[in-house]
Regions:
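Active-site rim beta-loop-alpha module in soluble metabolic enzymes
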Residues: 127-176
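Expand to "…catalyze enediolate/carbanion chemistry for C-C bond making/breaking, isomerization
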Residues: 81, 165, 194, 202, ...
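His/Asp/Glu-rich mid-to-C-terminal helical/loop segments that flank catalytic regions of hydrolases
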Residues: 209-232
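Glycine-rich beta-alpha junction loops
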Residues: 25, 95, 157-161, 187, ...
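A C-terminal functional module that forms or caps the active site or interfaces directly
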Residues: 167-206
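Metabolite-binding pocket within alpha/beta catalytic cores that recognizes anionic/polar moieties
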Residues: 1-128, 134-135
Length: 232
């Protein structure tokens, strides 16, 4: 496919080799305006804002990825395969599954289980294990230590279903030691693997699946600074 694509008006060279991808395009706008020097908007199609600027001398882009694996799948596929992006770091919210993972904690997704059939397109003779880039995981852990930010590192689950009809679903993933639930990492990790590129998920816990604890939608846009700074 030629660029611009139906979903992204950027031209070749408008997007950095490293892209941060929150689900919320307003969070992308917040990151660009708060952290990037001289940010330039490269996309507004469907209000999925994308910006490129510099952070501590390094060119960085930030772009919304939407909700769910189909949306993340489209945007990350185009970035990897049409815009020559090398690294995508998803920064988003997640629901905690374990007792020792609390609201506002940061989780580094080392791997992502999924109930999606996204991987069926590859026609593999088995089940693929969507995994983050080790180099990005190790670097994120190192930066978190430098900042004094405690993090949980482990497995997350990427689900196609936000409102599940099965009340036992969360309990089953919890028993397997999965740290939290979200909706995008597995597709991102699979796209990266297929393209021979790098990917990582850094998540902030916005609510707890087994306790009545949550933060507001507004706070999700603007208060996840520790996660953002690790990703940058």
């Amino acid at each position: 496919m030629c660029i611009p694509t139906p979903h992204n008006t950027a031209k070749k060279g408008d997007i950095a080799k490293k892209v941060l991808m929150p689900g919320d395009p307003l969070r992308a706008k917040y990151i660009a305006e708060t952290y990037l020097e001289n940010p330039v908007c490269f996309n507004t199609v469907r209000n999925m804002f994308g910006y490129t600027g510099t952070y501590k001398g390094e060119q960085v882009s930030v772009m919304g990825g939407g909700m769910g694996m189909p949306s993340m799948g489209i945007y990350s596929y185009e970035l990897y395969n049409f815009y020559d992006v090398e690294k995508i770091i998803r920064i988003g919210s997640a629901g905690a599954l374990q007792d020792d993972v609390n609201v506002m904690d940061v989780v580094i997704a080392m791997s992502a289980c999924t109930d999606s059939n996204y991987g069926s397109q590859y026609q593999l003779p088995g089940t693929f294990a969507p995994t983050a880039s080790y180099n990005l995981v190790a670097r994120a852990v190192e930066v978190a230590k430098e900042q004094g930010t405690p993090v949980h590192v482990g497995t997350v689950v990427s689900s196609d279903v936000f409102y599940s009809d099965n009340p036992e679903t969360s309990k089953a993933w919890r028993k397997m030691g999965v740290l939290c639930a979200e909706m995008e990492c597995a597709a991102l990790f699979m796209n990266a693997a297929r393209a021979g590129k790098e990917a990582l998920g850094i998540l902030t816990i916005s609510d707890h699946m087994f306790r009545e604890e949550a933060i507001s939608a507004e706070a999700r846009q603007t208060s996840f600074n520790k996660m953002m700074e690790i990703a940058l």
